[in-house]
Amino acid sequence: MADKYGPIFSLQLGIHKTIVVSSWAVAKECFTTHDKVFLTRPKSLAGKHMGYDHSVFLFLAYGPYWRDTRKLLIVELLSNRRLDVLKHVRESEVNSFVREMYEQWISNGGGGSKAVVEMKERFGYLTMNVILRMVAGKRYSGTEVYSDEARRFQKALGDLLHLVVLSMVSDAVPLFGWIDALRGYTGEMKNTAKEIDHVLGRWLKEHRQKRETLSINESEHDFIHGMQSVMDGSQFTEHDTDKAI
């Protein structure tokens, strides 16, 4: 279609007019030069059921709440200073990863003995532990002691990422939302949201209790602690504070 209609053209997908870009120069204009024009996203079934009715940054429309949330993300999670403070997390997790590999080698007799190792799964544990420690101060160890809660959360997170990218009939034609329900996607989204909400809710409660009873040094100050500190007693958002975090 790009060969026929050029590097930029529009399609009508249900109730939404969609622009298709196939040129890096045009893409730069859209997402760099005029990025604010393209920030607003249409409401979606995934945003409704898995994004706390479009309160999560991924599903937000551009506006004051989007700007405030983005500023907090950059300062509390993605700033050079924050990444430097939490450098020890990445180092310790890589060390643990290598140590577990070495211990498995020793348990197999060492020397010239060989063993098949599922590296994809192990790298998944490594990535998950780094992210969870930086965000929530949690560590779900790999291999056999990887907890049931960790597996449930990892599965729910994988389901969320899978469901978010699927095309839903109701996103294009809301009147036909019943089709998504018949296909089972609506129920899957609700169940996935409950699984994630259960875990995140417990983390928030634990962090709140820890802040009330203990002093927290900077190296232990994860993303949830930072967000709670900013939001406690502030008028940052009209949304529920826990949902915003």
Swiss-Prot record:
<dbReference type="InterPro" id="IPR002401">
    <property type="entry name" value="Cyt_P450_E_grp-I"/>
</dbReference>
<dbReference type="GO" id="GO:0020037">
    <property type="term" value="F:heme binding"/>
</dbReference>
<dbReference type="Pfam" id="PF00067">
    <property type="entry name" value="p450"/>
</dbReference>
<dbReference type="InterPro" id="IPR001128">
    <property type="entry name" value="Cyt_P450"/>
</dbReference>
<comment type="similarity">
    <text>Belongs to the cytochrome P450 family.</text>
</comment>
<keyword id="KW-0349">Heme</keyword>
<dbReference type="InterPro" id="IPR036396">
    <property type="entry name" value="Cyt_P450_sf"/>
</dbReference>
<keyword id="KW-0560">Oxidoreductase</keyword>
<dbReference type="InterPro" id="IPR050651">
    <property type="entry name" value="Plant_Cytochrome_P450_Monoox"/>
</dbReference>
<protein>
    <recommendedName>
        <fullName>Cytochrome P450 CYP82H23</fullName>
        <ecNumber>1.14.-.-</ecNumber>
    </recommendedName>
</protein>
<dbReference type="GO" id="GO:0004497">
    <property type="term" value="F:monooxygenase activity"/>
</dbReference>
<keyword id="KW-0479">Metal-binding</keyword>
<dbReference type="GO" id="GO:0016705">
    <property type="term" value="F:oxidoreductase activity, acting on paired donors, with incorporation or reduction of molecular oxygen"/>
</dbReference>
<dbReference type="GO" id="GO:0005506">
    <property type="term" value="F:iron ion binding"/>
</dbReference>
<keyword id="KW-0503">Monooxygenase</keyword>
<comment type="function">
    <text>Probable heme-thiolate monooxygenase.</text>
</comment>
<dbReference type="GO" id="GO:0046246">
    <property type="term" value="P:terpene biosynthetic process"/>
</dbReference>
<keyword id="KW-0408">Iron</keyword>
